[in-house]
């Protein structure tokens, strides 16, 4: 079963929660993973809009509305429902290795372009992912008496047919020498969303092939 909703709209989220209530469906696990995250290839086409000097407040607002405000609203609504019946629950926020390290803008560089024209990872990505860490810690200490735990998973880059030069640049920064395979985070998600992690609360699990230790 699935429902479409706008995570940046509390009204939309409440509508879905009401539909679930009508069907006596309880949310036991909430995974916040919505984001506006441009692919590396698209950064090259949006140089003038991704660089900090040209980054618009409209884009800032729209990306934070989805990636950070959306996680707050979903946690507020669905976490609040979990807390009502004392059956506990789990909130998992999907952050990023860029929640603990700065983006290395060199991996996006293009030859024969002066610095002010080089594509970069947008500022919003780091701000949102770092913000999720703070949100998780807040939630972890807000409902513990209700049996609700909150943690983060911070994945590194996932290989998905990106530009070869980008893949090599990023892989050079990772001790394992490669990007993650698309299914390599399943085990961590299952762990964090199960009783196997019953004593874990307010933590950030970084799975980045070792990138953040260099």
Question: What name fits each language-model region?
Answer:
Residues 15-22, 41, 46-65:
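Active-site Tyr-X3-Lys motif and surrounding loop/helix of classical short-chain dehydrogenase/reductase
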Residues 49, 113, 190, 201-214:
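Short C-terminal tail/terminal secondary-structure segment
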Residues 49-57, 83, 92-145:
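Catalytic loop of short-chain dehydrogenase/reductase
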Residues 144-149, 200-202:
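Short, small/polar-rich loop/turn modules that mediate ligand/substrate recognition or access, typified
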Residues 174-185, 196:
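A conserved structural motif in NAD(P)-dependent oxidoreductases
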């Amino acid at each position: 079963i699935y429902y479409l909703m706008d995570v940046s709209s509390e009204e939309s989220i409440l509508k879905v929660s009401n539909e679930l209530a009508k069907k006596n469906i309880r949310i036991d696990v909430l995974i916040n993973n919505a984001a506006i995250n441009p692919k590396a290839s698209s950064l090259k086409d949006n140089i003038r809009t991704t660089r900090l000097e040209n980054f618009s407040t409209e884009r800032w607002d729209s990306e934070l509305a989805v990636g950070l405000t959306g996680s707050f609203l979903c946690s507020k609504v669905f976490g609040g429902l979990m807390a009502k019946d004392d059956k506990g629950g789990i909130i998992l926020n999907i952050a990023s290795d860029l929640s603990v390290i700065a983006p290395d803008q060199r991996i996006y560089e293009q030859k024969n372009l002066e610095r002010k024209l080089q594509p970069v990872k947008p500022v919003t990505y780091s701000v949102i992912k770092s913000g999720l860490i703070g949100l998780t810690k807040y939630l972890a200490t807000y409902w513990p008496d209700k049996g609700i735990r909150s943690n983060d998973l911070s994945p590194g880059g996932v290989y998905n047919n990106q530009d070869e030069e980008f893949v090599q640049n990023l892989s050079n920064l990772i001790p394992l020498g490669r990007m993650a395979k698309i299914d390599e985070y399943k085990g961590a998600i299952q762990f964090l969303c199960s009783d196997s992690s019953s004593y874990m609360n307010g933590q950030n699990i970084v799975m980045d092939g070792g990138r953040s230790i260099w």
